[in-house]
Amino acid sequence: MADDNGFLKGPITRLFEKVARWIGLSINAGPVLAALFMESYDTGNRMCSDDICKATGYSRANAGLIISQLEALGVVEGRRDYDQTGRGRKRVLYAIDGTFGDIFNLGVMSLLDRLGAMMKDIQSIDDLRSGREDSLVPMLNDIRKVIQGRIESLEAVSSAEITR
């Protein structure tokens, strides 16, 4: 992957650091995402872990950990390079699996999961209270209303096409 213009050190890296945080990963995943996206758009090729290390400056262990996290989320797909000659284990070539919209929706789904967990907590509090009327009722109703509104908004966002 060519880095002739220093993109991985500047605004593109910062953008992908924010993307990494959006999907629940450390900002350290940002340069790996940037390298894979740039390679995808630049050449359409996959990258081996050595190429990712060279592009990001990360050690093999650090790059491997980040790649594993991205694979677990379904953001990155690895395939063995059967064109590689010689003995031994074939290297794995990595590429982004899906579109930027798919990755964006991972962040939305994460928020929906957290809001759903909050709704379950409210339901547990209601169940423990066993129908007692007290000062918690208005507070819980307000919280429930806000969370439900956010869930509906996020569901609309995740199903909408981004047109900007």
Model-predicted regions and their roles:
Residues L25-N45:
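Short helix->loop/beta-hairpin flanking segments within DNA-binding domains
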Residues A63, I67-L70:
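Helix-turn-helix DNA-binding helix
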Residues N45-T56:
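A short alpha-helical element within helix-turn-helix/winged-helix DNA-binding domains
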Residues E71-Y82:
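A short, conserved structural fragment
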Residues G101-V146:
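Amphipathic alpha-helical dimerization/coiled-coil segments
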Residues L25-N28, C48, D81-L106:
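Short, cationic-aromatic polyanion-contact patches
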Residues D3-V32:
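Short alpha-helical segments that sit at the start of domains
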